[in-house]
From Swiss-Prot:
Gene Ontology cellular-component annotations: DNA-directed RNA polymerase complex; virion component
GO MF annotation, one: metal ion binding
GO biological process per UniProt: DNA-templated transcription
Protein name as annotated: DNA-directed RNA polymerase 132 kDa polypeptide
Subunit structure: The DNA-dependent RNA polymerase used for intermediate and late genes expression consists of eight subunits (147) kDa, (133) kDa, (35) kDa, (30) kDa, (22) kDa, (19) kDa, (18) kDa and (7) kDa totalling more than 500 kDa in mass. The same holoenzyme, with the addition of the transcription-specificity factor RAP94, is used for early gene expression.
Organism: Cowpox virus (strain Brighton Red) (CPV)
Length: 1164
């Protein structure tokens, strides 16, 4: 539709990122980061975690030790493909095996002697079963074959029930920036976490808190529960860094506002007063005394030297191999941020900012669980050895303990929605459609439980840090997840890195930093600290920071470090720090590079001519300075121009202020929002509603629908959308379809299509329009003896069963039909009975309102008979079914009209769907009209000038004016029919037609908007929701209809329903519904003296209250409802007396009637 001009080079570069890049191993861009994350875990990280050699127990001053060694870790892929697994109803797991050796080391004069205690060579087929992530095209990390099946989505797990599941990515609780908090006026805390690098196993966590109270500056302490002493932060920094207090004062005061300098002087002076209050103060003695006091307080079994080494050596685990002096300087840099944040809180990243968080991807979930369960496994072995030694006097391990690592249970819980016992839920979803299985693995969410508990969270508001990296439209509009779940934009991904790559990258960066002159990277007093993953490595001369960052970024883009996703952030604003991030879990996306006021895209004239033949990785190699991968922290502290158009309108001096430039607006949407059209032309809420509805749209048939026993609703005759965006095409959503093209008319039809009501043509339905097939899984478990029992009396429920007790293939199940034999029998203890065996049917029945055909039946025989039945049903649109356009113009079928009842145009064409025209004005969905215009224009000219079929590009968010699209439609019509008059051309462009009344065959007075559009059928189907019934089961307590459509439940007749009938004055109806039915009728006797309901004792009605007082009151029989009696009984049980009183009226007397004389009048 558009020409590839220089002004649209940014759009073409953005498209290059979305398409597959086989040279870089990217076959499916939307979920590539999930595939890499999981493959890193199962191919590398699992081996690193399970390979262990460490002491379990030590005796006699470490001269005797019980050791455990786990080795020979092997991961074996399954013998079959994911398709076969789903057909069989099996889980799709890889098998991990290892060897465990437990031995005793004794240190002797001759050396170390080793005595074997126990060993286990894990060859059990169920030792560790790891659910495999199935990638696009049924790929998995252990299968080198890459066969791509167009309609097989990736990013799912298959669990035992053969339900493919996907889950969102949770935000880690640990923040990379310390969390600032105002405890009370003039009292603040600064808490941070320190986590050991990935090469240190098991992972060590430490959580520290710096407290500061303006009224007690001497108590400005750092503390950590049971892992560190409580000590003055200034004195600890002095102890570690070995510098004077004046050095610390100058370091904290450098480049700080006057108010912060005043607080710095006060803190340093308070630390001086603290030292002066102690006679002959020595910093080493002071720290040693605190360590000894903590040793006594904790009652540690370690010696004082071991305790001190353990505490100080493990201080700041993320700087594990760093000298204490650098740890001291790191604490000074933290204190700088803390003091600055007290006065300028708004300039510091808050705890809800995505700058502070890393994100857990699928591989990280399994990695975390493997860590935790391995520690539990080793702990169980240790406890078992101690118990055996205590009870039997031998070092032995039960084989049961060795063969149950516990990982299987943890992994199965993960797919059920439970991540860790102490953490929030991991939201999982069944596999239904293409849209869901792209959007959910790309969703990022906070722990709902954590947000509920903590009062500090404000994440429910759209946080500024989410801009550009998250889709602003695809967010939950209701429910507990509002504001907690966000969708990544199409350009965003999450970083992954192997441990070996991490160490090599860290080494290269450190070598680069140390290549600078030694004095320039040792400005620890007034320089800019350089940190790699929060670990301090140097402090740079302030005069060199700009050159350092610019050179580092250039080298990064050129591949000098071997990783293009390294993040380097220059934090100015008095906090003065250069942060280099290389870890996993960071949000990254590409940006256009601006260098010295020039957009580097414009400096490369060869780029435009070669772009069509290049992949994204080719651009990064051959034109490295055009695009840079930037993480969210670097983006937040950089100057980024909103668009190329705005950048080019600026002056030269203004351009030099920018570091990066963004891509067009369409790349800020997620993949779900990209399936919509022109959301920037509509009102804001339409975008949010449109995303929610698009995920509910029924898509085309997925693989093996007739074989695998799984739930699903599938479109039978799908069509590829004509009006699409590039993201919709590259993600394969367009190719796999989620709707059909229908002809619509915007008009009123006899007042039937009011509000959301739509009219749909009967012949359109009969021809398969928006026809779907429902696949439904029914699963029952039957005790073996019940399944083998024979029925004594013929039951209609068993009419569809074969002689083997299973439902017949191709049988049509109706409501009440059994799917398998389940007969319970009981023996009567009656010696005189001729047949003391009774049996009754307890089978689960088919409960759906519609008939379904049996497609597949599976049986598993164990202690129980597990029967799984797959039923299929073609379901055409009926009254009440829900539909929508891609602009959130939802509609419900209000009337199915025959073709003869519908208006027609001059060619006799009638609309398939009639939509209320006022909905366009009330919902302001202009882009719906544009979509109809572009779809109609495509029908006039479906091929480009080269004779190739080309869809129309109408991105979800675009900066193209409506006039441009009108001009495109005009050119299409002029090309196909150049002889059109201006009026005819205008009518065709704007899809205006004269329709004729079917009753009079006369044209309507005004033209009607009439044209094709892509229409979606939603999952909300009438027959799946209908629960109204006239007769059926009732609950025993309240005798109302039981709940749940699956259990054959109905709608309760409650207060609101009663009030509606009262409003209409339908007294007899209320009496009939609430009282006169057989089940609800209840006779009770009421005491006229106290108002209690009489009790029945030995068949005699007695008022208990009055009988104790030796009274003999009158009992009156009344008829009431059972619910009323239950209510009164429950109120009495809670100590509330409800008295039933009778209305007492005085007797009425009438005057005597006048006498009537019956004599004939002539006698009178």
């Amino acid at each position: 539709m558009k020409k590839n001009t220089d002004s649209e080079m940014d759009q073409r570069l953005g498209y290059k990122f979305l398409v597959p890049d086989p040279k870089a191993g990217v076959f499916y861009r939307p979920l590539h980061f999930q595939y890499v994350s999981y493959s890193n875990f199962i191919l590398h990280r699992l081996h690193e975690i399970l390979t262990v050699k460490r002491p379990l127990l030590s005796f006699k001053n470490n001269t005797e030790r019980i050791m455990i060694e786990i080795s020979n870790v092997k991961v074996t892929p399954p013998d079959y493909s994911p398709i076969i697994a789903s057909i069989k109803g099996k889980s799709y797991d890889a098998l991990a095996t290892f060897t465990v050796n437990i031995f005793k080391e004794v240190m002797t004069k001759e050396g170390i002697s080793i005595t074997k205690i126990s060993s286990y060579e894990g060859k059990d087929s169920h030792l560790i079963k790891i659910p495999l992530l199935i990638g696009y095209g049924n790929k998995n990390p252990l299968d080198t074959a890459k066969y791509l099946v167009p309609n097989v989505i990736g990013g799912v797990f298959i669990n035992k029930q053969s339900v493919e599941k996907v889950g969102i990515n949770l935000v880690e609780k640990i923040t990379t920036w310390p969390k600032f908090r105002v405890v009370k006026p003039n009292s603040f805390t600064f808490s941070f976490s320190s986590v050991s690098p990935p090469n240190v196993l098991p992972t060590r966590y430490r959580h520290y808190k710096i407290s500061l109270d303006i009224s007690q500056l001497e108590a400005s302490n750092i503390s950590s529960t049971k892992t560190f002493i409580t000590v003055n932060i200034v004195l600890l920094s002095q102890y570690l860094s070995r510098v004077s207090l004046e050095f610390i004062r100058r370091s904290l005061s450098y480049d700080m506002p006057p108010e912060v300098v005043y607080l710095v002087n006060a803190i340093i002076d308070s630390a001086k007063r603290l030292t002066e209050s102690i006679t002959d103060f020595n910093i080493d003695t002071y720290i040693n005394d605190l360590v000894e006091a903590e040793h006594i307080k904790q009652k540690s079994q370690l010696t004082i030297n071991e305790f001190k080494y353990e505490m100080l050596h493990n201080f700041l685990p993320h700087m594990n191999y760093t000298p204490d002096q650098l740890k001291g300087f790191y604490m000074i840099s933290l204190l700088r941020k803390f003091l600055y944040c007290i006065y300028h809180t708004s300039r510091y990243p808050d705890r809800d900012s995505m700058v502070c968080h890393r994100i857990l991807t699928y591989g990280k979930y399994f990695e975390t669980l493997a860590h935790d369960e391995l520690e539990n496994y080793i702990g169980n072995i240790r406890n078992d050895i101690m118990n055996n030694h205590k009870n039997r006097g031998t070092y032995a391990v039960n084989i049961h303990v060795l063969t149950t690592p516990g990982l299987n249970h943890a992994f199965s819980s993960l797919l059920s929605g439970k991540f860790k016992k102490s953490d929030g839920s991991y939201r999982t979803h069944p596999h239904y459609s293409w849209m869901q299985n792209i959007s959910i693995p790309r969703s990022v969410g906070f722990y709902p439980d954590q947000v509920k508990i903590s009062k500090m969270f404000s994440v429910r508001k759209y946080h500024p840090s989410q801009y550009l990296y998250f889709c602003s439209s695809d967010v939950p509009e209701r429910g507990p997840q509002v504001g907690l779940v966000s969708q990544l934009s199409v350009l965003s991904s999450i970083t992954n890195i192997l441990t070996s790559e991490y160490l090599d990258l860290e080494k290269k960066i450190c070598e680069y930093i140390r290549s600078y002159y030694k004095d320039d990277i040792s400005y620890f007093e007034t320089g800019f600290p350089i940190t790699i993953e929060n670990a301090l490595v140097a402090s740079l001369n302030p005069n060199m920071i700009c050159d350092f960052v610019t050179d580092f970024r250039r080298r990064k883009r050129m591949g000098f470090f071997g990783n293009l996703e390294v993040g380097i952030t220059l934090v100015r604003d008095h906090m003065n720090e250069i942060r280099i991030n290389i870890g996993a879990g960071r949000l990254v996306r590409p940006f256009l590079v601006v260098d010295n006021g020039e957009l580097m895209m414009d400096v490369c004239p060869e780029l435009e001519s070669r772009l069509d033949d290049m992949t994204f990785s080719d651009i990064q190699k051959e034109f490295p300075h055009v695009i840079e991968m930037v993480d969210i922290e670097q983006f937040t502290f950089s100057n980024v121009c909103e668009s190329v158009q705005k950048f080019r309108m600026m002056s030269k001096d203004e351009r030099k202020q920018y570091d990066l430039c963004d891509f067009p607006a369409e790349f800020r949407d997620g993949y779900v929002a990209s399936s919509l059209v022109g959301i920037n032309h509509n009102s804001g809420p339409r975008a949010i509603l449109g995303c929610a509805q698009a995920k509910q749209a029924i898509s085309c048939l997925s693989s093996d629908i007739r074989n695998k026993i799984d739930n699903g609703i599938h479109l039978m005759y799908p069509e590829r959308p004509i009006v699409i965006s590039k993201a919709l095409e590259t993600s394969k959503i367009a190719a796999n379809c989620f709707g059909q093209h229908v002809t619509i008319a915007l008009m009123s039809y006899k007042g039937i299509n009011q509000e959301d009501g739509i009219i749909i043509k009967k012949q359109f339905i009969q021809r398969g329009g928006l026809d779907i097939v429902t696949a439904k899984k029914h699963q029952v478990e039957i005790p073996l003896e019940n399944f083998n029992n024979k029925e004594r009396d013929r039951s209609n429920a068993y009419s569809k069963l074969e002689s083997n007790g299973l439902v017949r293939l191709n049988a049509f199940l109706e409501s009440g039909d059994a799917m398998a034999r389940n007969i319970s029998s009981r023996t009567l203890e009656d010696d005189f009975a001729r047949d003391n065996q009774i049996s009754f049917d307890v089978s689960e029945k088919y409960t759906d309102m519609y008939k379904s055909r049996v497609e597949r039946v599976q049986v598993e025989l164990t202690d129980k008979v597990k029967v799984r039945v797959l039923t299929m049903k073609e379901r055409r649109p009926i009254l009440g079914d829900k539909f929508t356009t891609r602009t959130s113009q939802k509609g419900t079928v209000a009337y199915i009209a025959d073709e003869t009842e519908l208006p027609y145009d001059e060619n006799g064409i009638t609309p398939d769907v009639i939509i209320n025209s006022t909905s366009i004005f009330s919902r302001k969905t202009i882009s719906m009209l544009i979509e109809v215009i572009l779809t109609a224009a495509y029908s006039a000219k479906p091929y480009n000038n080269k004779g190739e079929n080309r869809p129309v590009c109408f991105p979800s968010s675009n900066e193209t004016s409506i006039d441009t699209y009108m001009q495109f439609a005009k050119q299409c019509y002029e090309h196909s029919n150049p002889k059109l008059s201006d009026e005819e051309l205008s009518d065709k462009i704007f899809c205006e037609k004269i329709l004729y009344d079917p009753e009079t065959d006369k044209p309507y007075a005004s033209k009607v908007f009439f044209g094709p559009i892509y229409y979606l059928r939603l999952r909300h189907l009438t027959q799946d929701k209908a629960t109204v019934r006239c007769r059926g089961k009732k609950t025993k307590l309240i005798r109302q209809a039981n709940e749940g459509r699956k259990r054959g439940g109905g709608i309760k007749f409650g207060e609101m329903e009663r009030d509606c009938l009262i409003a209409h004055g339908a007294a007899n109806t209320i009496t009939e519904v609430l009282k006169d039915s057989e089940e609800d009728y209840q006779d009770v006797y009421v005491c006229e003296n106290c108002g209690d309901i009489a009790a029945q004792i030995k068949g005699i009605n007695t008022c208990l209250r009055c009988s104790k007082l030796n009274l003999s009151p009158l009992l009156t029989k009344i008829d009431t409802t059972h619910v009323s009696k239950v209510f009164l009984t429950q109120m009495n049980a809670r100590g509330v007396k409800v008295k039933l009183d009778f209305e007492r009226r005085p007797p009425s007397f009438y005057k005597p009637l006048d006498k009537v004389d019956l004599k004939p009048s002539f006698l009178a």
